[in-house]
């Protein structure tokens, strides 16, 4: 009898170890490069959640390289703050079964790349992104880069070009692009086919030149989402002490605008014009408006929609935003700067993707 019990117990233990080994072998190991951008914390909360289900199942942030930037005074402060949060995340649950293995902190990019299958770049200083991305892409690791993709159109093109050459999937995006209240305006039943869109959001006139793509990307990605994607052929830009106003004309004649708010209350939303009606868009983190009423008492989803897209990407290798669209947004911002320098002249858009 005792021998039978021992044999049964042994089989159970072996089965458990076998299951754990299979799970470990199947685990998609994610690494973070640079943690001084809050995205490092926001998305890890979803990717490392105990007993994750659905798209988040079978993956985890396992290692991070907390490199910072000497040119950003806040880099060290934020890096230390987010490192503390990441180190403690899911480490002291009420139920021990809910504990998650701690994130390993490494001291080199080479060491990070040895430990992971995929990488997320969250360095606050976008000037670092190109060099960081080159190492990741040459190592063949699927790569997501927190906005902005790069600090210049030239660096953005170089990153996407290398991704294509190495056949390594890579993309970047703002969480606003996937927020339900914005993405849900495409084919909204009260709007119909989108004819035009006016988006608005923050614009900091004191932003250093290297950060000029940081804030506008939230609203410009919202604009591209609602308008249905790329196709801009020309841009004009008017600039005053209170407003940065960019008007983009699509090749089919539709017009979209971006109002960058420099002074006064800052909100992020849009007005959408369609063949059935005109409606305000929702607000970040909430659902689509109904009869012009924007929901605010529904579930706040925040970063979850983009976290979902990142998880899908790491599982499938399919990017939700094509390189050509990302580079067109950089071309639009470049053309807007040129238009502003020429007193608001119409500037044709360059196709950065085809000329890469």
For every predicted segment, state its role.
Residues 239-241, 251-314, 318-324, 328, ...:
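NAD(P)-dinucleotide binding in Rossmann-like oxidoreductases
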Residues 149-209, 219:
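A contiguous active-site-proximal alpha/beta segment in oxidoreductase catalytic domains
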Residues 140-142, 147-148:
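Short helix/strand-capping hinge loops at secondary-structure junctions
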Residues 22-139, 165, 250, 313:
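N-terminal glycine-/serine-/threonine-rich beta1-alpha1-beta2 phosphate-ribose binding loop
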Residues 7-19:
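Bacterial N-terminal signal peptides
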Residues 198-266, 324-327, 331:
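Rossmann-like dinucleotide-binding domain that binds NAD(P)(H)
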């Amino acid at each position: 009898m005792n021998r039978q019990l021992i044999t049964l117990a042994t089989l159970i233990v072996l089965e458990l170890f076998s299951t754990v080994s299979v799970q470990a072998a199947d685990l998609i190991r994610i690494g973070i490069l640079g943690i001084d951008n809050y995205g490092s914390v926001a998305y890890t909360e979803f990717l490392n959640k105990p007993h994750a289900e659905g798209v988040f199942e079978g993956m985890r942030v396992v290692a991070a390289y907390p490199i910072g930037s000497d040119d950003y005074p806040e880099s060290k402060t934020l890096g230390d703050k987010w490192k503390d949060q990441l180190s403690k995340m899911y480490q002291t649950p009420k139920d021990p079964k809910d504990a998650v293995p701690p994130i390993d902190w490494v001291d080199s990019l080479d060491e990070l790349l040895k430990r992971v299958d995929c990488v997320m770049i969250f360095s606050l200083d976008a000037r670092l992104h190109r060099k960081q991305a080159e190492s990741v892409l040459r190592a063949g690791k699927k790569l997501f880069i927190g906005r902005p993709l790069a600090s210049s159109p030239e660096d953005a093109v170089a990153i996407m070009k290398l991704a294509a050459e190495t056949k390594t999937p890579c993309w970047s995006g703002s969480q606003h692009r996937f927020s339900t209240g914005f993405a849900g305006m495409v084919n909204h039943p009260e709007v119909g086919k989108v004819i035009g869109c006016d988006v608005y959001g923050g614009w900091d006139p004191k932003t250093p030149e290297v950060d000029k793509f940081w804030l506008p990307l939230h609203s410009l990605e919202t604009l591209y989402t609602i308008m249905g994607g790329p196709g801009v052929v020309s841009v004009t830009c008017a600039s005053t002490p209170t407003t940065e106003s960019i008007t983009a004309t699509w090749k089919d004649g539709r017009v979209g605008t971006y109002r960058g708010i420099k002074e006064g209350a800052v909100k992020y939303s849009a007005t959408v014009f369609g063949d059935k009606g005109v409606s305000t868009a929702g607000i970040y983190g909430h659902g689509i408006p109904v009869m012009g009423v924007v929901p605010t008492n529904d579930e706040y989803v925040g970063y979850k929609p983009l976290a979902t897209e990142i998880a899908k990407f790491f599982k499938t290798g399919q990017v939700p935003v094509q390189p050509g669209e990302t580079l067109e947004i950089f071309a639009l911002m470049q053309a807007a700067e040129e238009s502003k320098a020429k007193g608001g002249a119409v500037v044709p858009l360059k196709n950065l993707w085809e000329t890469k």
